Amino acid sequence: MGSRLNFKSFVDGVSEQQPTVGTSLPLTRQNSVFSLTFDEFQNSWGGGIGKDFGSMNMDELLKNIWTAEESHSMMGNNTSYTNISNGNSGNTVINGGGNNIGGLAVGVGGESGGFFTGGSLQRQGSLTLPRTISQKRVDDVWKELMKEDDIGNGVVNGGTSGIPQRQQTLGEMTLEEFLVRAGVVREEPQPVESVTNFNGGFYGFGSNGGLGTASNGFVANQPQDLSGNGVAVRQDLLTAQTQPLQMQQPQMVQQPQMVQQPQQLIQTQERPFPKQTTIAFSNTVDVVNRSQPATQCQEVKPSILGIHNHPMNNNLLQAVDFKTGVTVAAVSPGSQMSPDLTPKSALDASLSPVPYMFGRVRKTGAVLEKVIERRQKRMIKNRESAARSRARKQAYTMELEAEIAQLKELNEELQKKQVEIMEKQKNQLLEPLRQPWGMGCKRQCLRRTLTGPW
């Protein structure tokens, strides 16, 4: 391959020699095991495991899937490449095996492939397994999905359908569908600018020479380049700005759905994990309730701060987005008065600050009298209870004083008796000492005793 680019292929207008590659789009999934059902995967890769996939937890299932995917990709390294090329434009579609699982590479240029986009599935690090289901068994996750489907079918049918519908079994579901519904795969929105228009990196060329066209079947729901300078122009959005606001809302909501319907089925079949389609909006979008006239909501242009002062009444609420300049007008359902009948004073009054009121009910005279009477009764009761407590305290004090007086008298009597008893004992001890010798007693005489035999 050379190093030159074929600039002749970048022409405005759709080339008649470009073939439709709609038949080669399923090549992105023919080398992936994610398109197999559980039964096919069990029959093909479950022989060496010796364990049913339904009894495994989600961690083991992912490990087995990635092991099978790696072995499958290693077997596909020698797969020959199939080229679908355009003679004049130089657009080449290459489908091959290798580590790029179900890869799809697209080359642009006459002799050199200067741009390649991979539609392959990323490796194991891209799949984030939630902690809530990492240790759950596959059968348990499948039962939860079936319960959600039953609840959804009951809500849609309203419980009126009496015909039992056949439920899909786990063996009939593909690995891709199971992982998406179980929440293992997180789809990220793809930016519009990455696939909107590709002109080879040169200014002044149209969008027909690149990949950002709907004619070659690679990019769906992309606008055509009408300016010739690589900038996508949405003619429908330009015309929608001049229409009334009531007619603009259904157009902005329904138009992306009408464009997505022809290509949505093809995209869901060609990719293992389809990306979400990003809807491009205009610079300023006004969404108004259909029940109100368009004169109530004024268009808000994005400014430095993104906020403009607009007249507002009690039934209109405007919110301005700082990035896209989106104006949302919400109308209160409680008031259906026409804006023509609304007086100007009401609009001026709505701009004034709302007083800080809690809506207290004014009390009447009877209520006040009842409150005063209740307070007086409470005061009387408090006084009576205080008087009773004081009387009890006084009586208790008097009883204590009487007991103290009695104890004092008894103490005095006991002290007197003690003094008398002590005097008597003292007198009894002193009486023998007061009597003289010879008086009242006989004098003893000495006598000679025999002390020997003579």
Swiss-Prot record:
Protein name: ABSCISIC ACID-INSENSITIVE 5-like protein 6
Task of the protein: Binds to the ABA-responsive element (ABRE). Mediates stress-responsive ABA signaling.
Domain of life: Eukaryota
PANTHER family on file: ABSCISIC ACID-INSENSITIVE 5-LIKE PROTEIN 6, CAMP-RESPONSE ELEMENT BINDING PROTEIN-RELATED
CDD domains per the UniProt record, alphabetical: bZIP_plant_BZIP46 (cd14707)
Region of interest (Basic motif), residue spans: 374-393
Alphabetically ordered keywords of this record: Abscisic acid signaling pathway, Activator, DNA-binding, Nucleus, Phosphoprotein, Transcription, Transcription regulation
Compartments, as annotated in UniProt: Nucleus
InterPro entries: bZIP, BZIP46-like, bZIP_sf
Expression sites (tissue/organ): Expressed in roots and flowers.
Entry's Gene Ontology cellular component terms: nucleus
Subunit and interaction comment: DNA-binding heterodimer. Interacts with ABI3 and the AFP proteins AFP1, AFP2, AFP3 and AFP4.
Domain bZIP: 372-435
Entry-annotated residues carrying Phosphothreonine: 169
Family indicated by similarity: Belongs to the bZIP family. ABI5 subfamily.
Modified residues (Phosphoserine): 32, 55, 126
Phenotype seen when the gene is deleted: Defective in ABA and stress responses.
GO MF annotation terms: DNA binding; DNA-binding transcription factor activity; sequence-specific DNA binding; transcription cis-regulatory region binding
Expression triggers: Up-regulated by drought, salt, abscisic acid (ABA).
GO biological process: abscisic acid-activated signaling pathway; positive regulation of DNA-templated transcription; response to abscisic acid; response to salt stress; response to water deprivation
Chain segments carrying region Leucine-zipper: 400-414
Gene behind this protein: ABF3
Keyword DNA-binding on entry: yes
